[in-house]
Amino acid sequence: MASQGTKRSYEQMETDGERQNATEIRASVGKMIDGIGRFYIQMCTELKLSDYEGRLIQNSLTIERMVLSAFDERRNRYLEEHPSAGKDPKKTGGPIYKRVDGRWMRELVLYDKEEIRRIWRQANNGDDATAGLTHMMIWHSNLNDTTYQRTRALVRTGMDPRMCSLMQGSTLPRRSGAAGAAVKGIGTMVMELIRMIKRGINDRNFWRGENGRKTRSAYERMCNILKGKFQTAAQRAMMDQVRESRNPGNAEIEDLIFSARSALILRGSVAHKSCLPACVYGPAVSSGYNFEKEGYSLVGIDPFKLLQNSQVYSLIRPNENPAHKSQLVWMACHSAAFEDLRLLSFIRGTKVSPRGKLSTRGVQIASNENMDNMESSTLELRSRYWAIRTRSGGNTNQQRASAGQISVQPTFSVQRNLPFEKSTVMAAFTGNTEGRTSDMRAEIIRMMEGAKPEEVSFRGRGVFELSDEKATNPIVPSFDMSNEGSYFFGDNAEEYDN
């Protein structure tokens, strides 16, 4: 990638750091994890949770959401100014599950946001520790990516539901900063920009006045983030066009959708980080492990090792399959919703199935669901091998992919060829090559036509044994190419509703 040198590594984004060396980065990421762990331990004490209840992923999600809501300044301000009945803007809470007389009970807890902020800061040596908050947001985002297929959102902005492999991070809040921007897929950025342009078309004052100036600079910033994700000159030039447009409108929306489609073959670079639930970090910290001292990385072996030694439980609805629930969470932990399933099966050591074949709904339990028949079971989050997370889209080739999802966005830096349905993708590029961007469009289409099926991505990269911490012996996996490679094949994944 041309601009590799100018970019900060993710760990630097993750920790708002200046240029740091590897050891400093590992220490500052470790410090962030320590803070989340200490906070989680304290919350379990406040809520009087048993060890088992503290390792329940549903309780972890509630506690994470409480602290994220306590620090959501814009929303807090909005709630104070627009009071709604029955909602106290100063309080936050959610369902906490406890085991009472041999059955699971739901208890709704409510805390002062001020109190939650105090506990969080205390766990983080008095800092606001924004990096830790962003880390939890990314974990929630990865879980959403694995659980839901954003069909409706794609269709609403004029994109194709089969482009779901570009939608990583589509549910991340706007306030997730540089670390959040790094993990957003091409489709997510395009969707945010299209929404913005549509508002400008409908609202004459959107780009005008004092506010309009801020809006404009946000628009240009988002264009630049998207440009930085593209790896070819023509795609980048197209983003310059969109950014410099005097009055963004339908022509820009067309160009954006074109560039998103092109990313199915000419993939963008999207960061991947293994962000684990707080209930994994808490017990590790309370067992005396010092993440800051030992150092930690979100993109290497560390999350795999941590999951090998963690016990996490989940509530299971009456007709759900615990093994399927485990797969869902395992994929979320490794930010692997859009990775090739054959590679995931190899790394995990058990077959990873497409979303539509899983008998499991989301991890969160709705407040109106009946608790009477709820069981709980251990989530199997261990792996057979580990692999390095990638930040590049790999290079492109073609191979049969599925009806539901026609491309992948690689998570792991491992040698393979990347599947995409070339005929399907190319069919979308008929006709329209006139207008200002015609030469770029022609160039992009030419590159896509040239993508060869036999090309291999991440050449020489492999997976590693869990005992191989220094990554000295890469094992290059061999795949059964007749197998299905896409997770959102067909598609019976539920919709994500805000």
From Swiss-Prot:
Residues 8-21 have a biased composition (Basic and acidic residues). Keywords: Capsid protein, Helical capsid protein, Host nucleus, Host-virus interaction, Ribonucleoprotein, RNA-binding, Viral nucleoprotein, Viral penetration into host nucleus, Virion, Virus entry into host cell. A motif (Bipartite nuclear localization signal) lies at residues 198-216. GO terms for cellular component: helical viral capsid; host cell; host cell nucleus; ribonucleoprotein complex; viral nucleocapsid. Pfam families: Flu_NP (PF00506). It comes from the Viruses. It is found in: Virion; Host nucleus. One of its GO terms (molecular function) is structural molecule activity. InterPro entries: Flu_NP. A motif (Unconventional nuclear localization signal) lies at residues 1-18. GO terms for biological process: symbiont entry into host cell; viral penetration into host nucleus. Late in virus-infected cells, may be cleaved from a 56-kDa protein to a 53-kDa protein by a cellular caspase. This cleavage might be a marker for the onset of apoptosis in infected cells or have a specific function in virus host interaction. SUPFAM superfamilies: flu NP-like. Residues 1-21 are annotated as: Disordered. Belongs to the influenza viruses nucleoprotein family. Homomultimerizes to form the nucleocapsid. May bind host exportin-1/XPO1. Binds to viral genomic RNA. Protein-RNA contacts are mediated by a combination of electrostatic interactions between positively charged residues and the phosphate backbone and planar interactions between aromatic side chains and bases. Encapsidates the negative strand viral RNA, protecting it from nucleases. The encapsidated genomic RNA is termed the ribonucleoprotein (RNP) and serves as template for transcription and replication. The RNP needs to be localized in the host nucleus to start an infectious cycle, but is too large to diffuse through the nuclear pore complex. NP comprises at least 2 nuclear localization signals that are responsible for the active RNP import into the nucleus through cellular importin alpha/beta pathway. This is Nucleoprotein. It comes from Influenza A virus (strain A/Kitakyushu/159/1993 H3N2).
